[in-house]
Amino acid sequence: AARHSDDPAKLKKYMKNIQVCGQNLLMLLNNVLDLARIENDKTEMEYSVSDIEKDFRNCLAMFRNQADSKGQTLTVTTQLLHPYIYADVPHLTEVCTNLVSNAVKYTGAGGTIRCGVTQKPGEKEGWCDTVVTVADNGIGMSQEFQQHIFEPFERERTSTVSKVEGSGIGMGIVKKL
């Protein structure tokens, strides 16, 4: 970045890249630590009231620029019985982040990613079951790999997938949480 200090546009671009790389590194480190805590039964749940639609949209906002830069369409739908739920918001956000991150990573230019939150009545009166979905028209995965997707550090090894950066930690965390 120092070499381009005379070009504000390039400097801004490089600084943004540095920021994104730093955020990605922090996310990777946090994922490794979370996985270690989960596997050692040291995960603590932090339940609080969540405005589920707002929290979900905030999570998706982290990926909006990345999706836009790839020409991807990122849509959100909600069908809620109760706008507020009692949930472990940090871990729910982590699950959503990992799912959407993978969808954006593995969906090509011009692809579509559909995210949704739906609720159905729960077993107890006044309660509901909340379902988060993330669907895309990305490159997909082989039938063989589908059996291993939730194993920590597992990544499909094909020429198409190998071009995509990732640690293979995210889906292991999703499964365990």
Annotate each predicted stretch with a short phrase.
Residues 20-25:
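Short alpha-helical segment of the dimerization/phosphotransfer core of two-component systems
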Residues 36-47:
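Helix-loop junction within the histidine kinase core
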Residues 46-61, 93:
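A conserved beta-strand-to-alpha-helix junction within the catalytic ATP-binding
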Residues 46-51, 68, 73-83, 118-120:
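Conserved catalytic submotifs in the C-terminal HATPase_c
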Residues 65, 139-140:
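Glycine-rich G1-box
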Residues 103-104:
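Short helix-loop "hinge" at the ATP-lid/N-box region of the Bergerat-fold HATPase_c
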Residues 110-126:
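Short beta-strand/loop element within the Bergerat-fold HATPase_c
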Residues 141-153:
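Short conserved segment of the HATPase_c
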